[in-house]
Design a protein with these regions (language model features):
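Sec-dependent N-terminal signal peptides
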Residues: 4-15
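N-terminal secretory-pathway/extracellular module detecting exported/lumenal segments
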Residues: 16-67, 73-125
């Protein structure tokens, strides 16, 4: 697991060909996940960041990509979804449908998609 995190962290640093969105991981399905490095901030013991799931084809609602705004707590390895933006175009382009419904705290497994994203952010802070 440690080797996987080191590999992912090195990818996080080197894959900056998407502008501010940095590719972190691909799922077994048809999604690629990114973190917006420019959005990272730490405040009062929490980390805040935007992440994105970019699909190869539209989902059942016609969305190609979804951006998520997270609040994370590295010490307890937990996070909340603070906002979602659903886009009909790839890489979050175009006008998106915004949902500001905040979730409860989630304790992801380190191997899950959101767990890997949180691990990458926590490695920076």
């Amino acid at each position: 697991m440690k080797k996987l995190l080191i590999l992912l962290f090195s990818l996080l640093i080197s894959f900056n060909s998407y502008g501010e969105w940095v590719k972190v991981i691909e799922s077994d399905g048809d999604h690629t996940y990114y973190i917006d490095i420019d959005s990272l901030k730490e405040e009062n013991g929490y980390v805040y960041y935007w992440a994105m799931a970019d699909g190869q084809k539209p989902d059942e609602w016609g969305d190609m990509s979804t951006r998520f705004y997270f609040q994370g707590e590295c010490g307890l390895f937990r996070l909340k979804y603070l906002s979602y933006i659903y886009s009909k175009q790839p890489m979050g382009r175009g006008d998106g449908e915004v949902d500001n419904t905040s979730s409860e705290w989630i304790h992801p497994t380190p191997e899950s998609i959101v767990g890997v994203l949180l691990s990458q952010v926590c490695a920076i802070y």
